[in-house]
């Protein structure tokens, strides 16, 4: 079958990362960690380490992206080149672009964008250490940062 692997995920009742099958990853959240952001968060979820910052609402640049009746949410999900064992190329790849788009779409539904015409709200997520589940962890960190902004 496609997608199957011979790698053993659980051995002697313990996962590869040392957790029991019914045990969740430990979560640590520290809010307000970035002085220059309107809202920010540092999150550790298992071995994942992620920073998130929210900036705005502010004037939208470039101006051609402005919406006369509402704000736009511009999310950017990036992984540091040193965040994984195999060196990752800096910048946005296809996966990062897709996650950035999904986060933008999700937050436009929960932020009162109609209250801020012609504005922009920027959500930056930086994965500094990745060990599976970074998309969910980054979204959680961004949600905490957004709640503080």
Language-model region placement:
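Short, Gly/Pro- and small/polar-rich lid/capping loops
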Residues: 2-35, 42-44
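A short glycine/serine-rich beta->alpha loop
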Residues: 88-92, 125-133
